[in-house]
């Protein structure tokens, strides 16, 4: 039964419709496919409960709100460079939400990359999970249309001259790639940590940057099959993909997580910092 579920979730889910004697194949969107995992107990249990952590900004980070085209407001944690710059990194949360661990990661990026502003987007609109049950509910309730509206609202906030890199983990790994697609010509880089890739080659063809893809070989969900398919699709789209695989498990890069792998974290973090430094 477990094997059948995995095949259903990770395989290509298609439906067919006939119009003028042509067959149209519809793929399950990446965000929806990843959200389906939350209905599986094994996936939820793989996410170790994060340790309590309170981040106090040393770089002047603060929460802001901005308008979105869908008529709603959005929230973000923003750290601005002392000297004005159009370089921005958009940060995307794990399935827990925009918690203090993500704010700490944002500040690390800000400090180590240099010459950038950093914006961690609240993709759950104020909801924050401290247990697996709510994390799963929030992830399943998330709609990509709303996510796209948040990213577009952020783009209006940073302006038409901004150069934007994206990074995220878990749920946010997939959102990092979706945001890179949404940002369009202003995208300069994209980093994914164990996130669900986009499968639509035609969409991938619109990417304005390469992608740095980081994943864990012990991850049962964002696994080798998923990663191999992503490589094939990026090649078909004519886009550069750099891949680093670590002998670790899903969530290894979260220092507040019991599954944290310090060696893999330090190496992947160094590669992420170097990647963004090469973009700005």
What are these regions (language model features)?
Residues 158-169:
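Alpha/beta-hydrolase fold nucleophile elbow
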Residues 168-172, 176:
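Gly/Ala-rich beta-loop-alpha elbow adjacent to hydrolase catalytic centers
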Residues 207, 213-215:
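Short beta-strand/loop motif that positions the catalytic acidic residue
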Residues 185-196:
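A conserved short beta-strand
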Residues 105, 223-233:
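Short alpha-helix in the alpha/beta-hydrolase fold that links the catalytic acid
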Residues 22-57, 62-157:
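Serine-hydrolase catalytic machinery in alpha/beta-hydrolase-like enzymes
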């Amino acid at each position: 039964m477990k094997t059948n579920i995995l095949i259903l979730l990770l395989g290509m889910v298609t439906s067919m419709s006939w119009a003028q004697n042509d067959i149209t194949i519809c793929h399950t969107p990446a965000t929806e496919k990843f959200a389906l995992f939350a209905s599986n107990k094994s996936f939820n249990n793989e996410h170790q409960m994060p340790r309590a952590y309170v981040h106090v900004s040393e770089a002047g980070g603060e929460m802001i709100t901005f308008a979105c085209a869908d008529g709603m407001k959005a929230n973000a944690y923003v750290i601005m460079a002392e000297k004005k710059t159009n370089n921005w990194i958009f940060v995307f949360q794990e399935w827990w939400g925009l918690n203090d661990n993500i704010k700490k990661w944002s500040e690390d990026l800000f400090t180590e990359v240099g010459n950038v502003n950093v914006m961690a987007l609240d993709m759950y609109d104020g909801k924050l999970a401290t247990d697996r049950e709510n994390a799963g509910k929030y992830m399943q309730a998330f709609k990509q249309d709303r996510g796209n509206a948040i990213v577009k609202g952020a783009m209006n906030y940073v302006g038409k001259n901004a150069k934007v890199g994206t990074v995220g983990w878990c749920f946010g790994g997939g959102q990092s790639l979706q945001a890179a697609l949404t940002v369009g010509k202003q995208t300069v880089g994209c980093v994914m940590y164990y996130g669900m890739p986009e499968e639509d080659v035609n969409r991938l063809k619109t990417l304005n940057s390469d992608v740095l893809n980081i994943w864990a070989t012990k991850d049962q969900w964002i696994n080798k099959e998923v990663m191999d398919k992503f490589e094939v699709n990026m090649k078909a789209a004519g886009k550069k993909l750099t891949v680093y695989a670590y002998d670790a498990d899903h969530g290894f890069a979260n220092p507040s997580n019991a599954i944290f792998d310090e060696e893999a974290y330090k190496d992947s973090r160094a590669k992420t910092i170097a990647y963004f430094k090469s973009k700005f």
